[in-house]
Amino acid sequence: MAKKSLIVKQQRKPKYRTRAYNRCKLCGRPHAYMRKFGICRLCFRDLAYKGQIPGVRKASW
């Protein structure tokens, strides 16, 4: 989990556009963010494993 203070700080509009960054909508993690889903890789993995993301399957070849 991310610090609550950092999540609140990120929600404010930054003074400069380059300071804006993406955070996971579920846990607030700033790294390994997937734009298409709006969540980090860890949350993506958990949700995909539970079958809560439609159209996502585990790769097997």
Curated annotation (Swiss-Prot):
Coiled coil: none annotated. One of its GO terms (cellular component) is small ribosomal subunit. The keyword Iron does not apply. One of its GO terms (biological process) is translation. PROSITE patterns: RIBOSOMAL_S14. GO terms for molecular function: rRNA binding; structural constituent of ribosome; zinc ion binding. The keyword Cytoplasm does not apply. Binds 1 zinc ion per subunit. Signal peptide: none annotated. Part of the 30S ribosomal subunit. Contacts proteins S3 and S10. Belongs to the universal ribosomal protein uS14 family. Zinc-binding uS14 subfamily. This is Small ribosomal subunit protein uS14. It comes from Acetivibrio thermocellus (strain ATCC 27405 / DSM 1237 / JCM 9322 / NBRC 103400 / NCIMB 10682 / NRRL B-4536 / VPI 7372) (Clostridium thermocellum). The gene is rpsZ.
